[in-house]
Swiss-Prot record:
Protein name: Acyl-CoA dehydrogenase IpdE1
GO biological process, any: cholesterol catabolic process
Pathway linked to the protein: Steroid metabolism; cholesterol degradation
Record-level Gene Ontology MF annotations: flavin adenine dinucleotide binding; oxidoreductase activity, acting on the CH-CH group of donors
Keyword hit for rRNA-binding: no
Gene3D superfamilies listed in its UniProt record: Acyl-CoA dehydrogenase/oxidase, N-terminal domain, Butyryl-CoA Dehydrogenase, subunit A, domain 2, Butyryl-CoA Dehydrogenase, subunit A, domain 3
Similarity field: Belongs to the acyl-CoA dehydrogenase family.
Co-factor note (free text): Binds 2 FAD per heterotetramer.
Source species, domain of life: Bacteria
Length: 385
């Protein structure tokens, strides 16, 4: 396997050579709340990364990946952030569904989908949350019934990121009549370009519309496009969520580090850094980011079997940190941040508005704390009613 520092130098050189010309204007684009920015141009950039073998770094070589270590992948994310490269467009495919198919998919599913994920020719979205099943995902009500050699799907998903730009969706649906909670769920791969699927973008407080409602009205997918066994969807879905931690989480933190660095520069430029309270909060933000990095590295380098509560602690750490950063940004800007939309501070106003949801989506803080309390600390269940 290639030496990590040699690989780092290779990535740095490739980015310097390729993030130029037509792609130079993409620097810094994309990211949370900004997925719409130059989407097709970023997709073309993502395809150039794939052609250079700089996607799917952790996938096994037999599945089209590089089979690289955690240290190599960390080095890639660090160099990618240092180059201010644009956010990639196929996170759900490369980081979530791909590893899930490698772990649970049939050989036919792997041959059908993994090359198209790797080459960024098919984009995916995640069909988990519903109007009545957000943080409490086990309350999923979307149904799928077998009709000959196809599943017939009915129901609604919500807060589905980038569904309007995706070709496929991995959907958690109830396939056993009368089942409740975690039982009777299946993990289906569903094409979105069909008459039975309607996608409605949701305009957010930021004015953008990355999230969507997705309606399934007798939508269909082939019977063999269930990942894992029918009825075992909860286990597969939870495995998918674990792939969001580790290197993927660390990559997210590197983006956060770039945001913090830009905010420090803004504080210097506006003289907000002269305020000792602002300086203290910037320092606390830096130490919090280092703590998250240490935690992410510890979980990646720890036991192969995931320890209970790791994902929940990670979610609490980054959600609170990023929301606090949005609040700090508004305090650095001061009054102009409240009265001058679409101006010099637009980027920071948008960050503040978007981060209000960080402690809600992906499992609210309250749900995360309940899980830690009940499943890790062994405390009594929360009283209901």
């Amino acid at each position: 396997m290639q030496d990590v520092e040699e690989f780092r130098a290779q990535v740095r050189g490739w980015l310097a050579d390729n993030l130029a010309g037509e792609f130079a204007a993409l620097k810094g684009l994309g990211g949370p709340g900004r997925e719409h920015e130059a989407f097709e141009e970023r997709r073309a950039w993502n395809q150039r990364l794939a052609a250079a073998g700089l996607t799917c770094l952790g996938w096994p070589e037999e599945h089209g990946g590089r089979g690289l270590s955690t240290a190599h992948r960390v080095a890639f994310y660090e160099e990618y952030a240092r180059a201010d490269a644009p956010d990639k467009v196929n996170h759900f495919g490369e980081e979530l569904l791909g590893p899930t198919l490698i772990a649970f998919g049939t050989p036919q599913q792997q041959r059908r989908f993994l090359p198209r994920i790797r080459d960024v020719t098919e984009l995916w979205c995640q069909g988990y949350s519903e109007p009545g099943a957000g943080s409490d995902l086990a309350s999923v009500a979307t149904t799928a019934e077998l009709d000959g050699d196809q599943w017939v799907i009915n129901g609604q998903k919500v807060w589905t990121s980038l569904a309007h730009l995706s070709q496929w969706c991995f959907v958690l649906a109830r396939t056993e009549k009368g089942s409740q909670r975690h039982a009777g769920l299946s993990y289906l791969l569903v094409p979105l370009d069909q008459p039975g699927v309607q996608i409605r973008p949701i305009v957010q407080i930021t004015g953008t519309a990355e999230f969507n409602e997705v309606f399934f009205d007798d939508a269909r997918t082939d019977a063999d496009l269930v990942v894992g066994a029918p009825g075992d969807g909860w286990r597969v879905a939870m495995a998918t969520l674990t792939f969001e931690r580790g290197v993927s989480t660390l990559g997210q933190q590197i983006v956060y580090a770039r945001e913090l660095s830009n905010l420090v520069e803004l504080a210097r430029r506006t003289a907000a850094a002269d305020d000792p309270l602002i300086r203290e909060r910037l320092t606390r933000a830096w130490t919090g980011l280092r703590a998250m990095r240490s935690y992410a590295l510890a979980t990646m380098e720890g036991p192969a079997v995931e320890q209970p509560g790791q994902d929940n602690v990670s979610k609490l750490l980054w959600a609170n940190w990023h929301r606090n950063l949005g609040e700090l940004a508004m305090d650095v800007i001061g009054k102009p941040g409240m009265t001058m939309p679409d101006g010099e501070f637009d980027e920071w106003q948008r960050l503040y508005l978007f981060t209000r949801a960080d402690t809600i989506y992906g499992g609210s803080n309250e749900i995360q704390r309940n899980i830690i309390a009940e499943r890790v600390l062994g405390l009594p269940r929360e009283a209901k009613g």
